[in-house]
Amino acid sequence: GGGPSAGPSVLGRVNEAMRRQPLLTSIVVTGAKAAAADLMIQAVVEKRARVDERRVATFGLFGATYQGCVQYFLFNHVLEWWRPGRSVRAVALKIAATNFCLDPVLFFPVFYSLREMLATGELGAHTVRAALAKYRENVFEDLRNSWGVWFPCHAVTYGLMPLHLRMPWVALVSFSYVGLLSFTRGDFDAIVLAEEEKPAASAQAEFAELAEPDSPMASAE
């Protein structure tokens, strides 16, 4: 009777609402997913006794602004204008453009700059320079991790997903990927402590307290 048909009707209404408001859906879903991923990493992986709200804010803001707005425009408008449709050639070119151009040139510089800004509480050219210097140090590892996730997953993005579901799909995948970024690039306390002019013994003690048990900082004397 009514029970079995209620599920599809609810899903249908949700899908229709997302189709009517794709940008709002993109912003809400990607921001929530990014913040939730960092909360998961802090609680489950790093086992922190206290949630680092600055990190959660970083990933939430990053998800809502870059992924929710910028990537929405790039994926659903720019790339579709450049190579419309779902032919093998069009999908392959969009995957290549995303992984070889958009992510290295836009995604990672924005990610590192936002992280540096929220970590230090400063905004300026020097903040961007410091962020890009860190990006250069990590570029090969970051791109390797990124390509391992997004080459196969963007085949689904461009080959299967309708436009209004592309960003929710990307958000679902990036729940895991942003967690990886959080775990490998999210030690805000280390950044702040490194910039404060504290006695070496005091700084080392705080580093040891904040560091992971198996991290180089924890074992450093």
Language-model features: locations:
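Functional transmembrane or membrane-interface alpha-helices that line membrane-embedded catalytic
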Residues: 128, 166-173, 196-199
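Alpha-helical transmembrane segments of eukaryotic organelle membrane transporters
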Residues: 19-47, 52-120, 135-189
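Transit-peptide-like, low-complexity N-terminal presequences
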Residues: 1-15, 190-221
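Coil-to-alpha-helix initiation sites in intrinsically disordered, low-complexity, charged segments
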Residues: 5-12, 22, 87, 91, ...
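Short juxtamembrane and helix-loop transition motifs at transmembrane-helix boundaries
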Residues: 128-136
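Short, motif-level signal for alpha-helix interfacial/capping segments enriched in acidic residues
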Residues: 80-82, 125-129
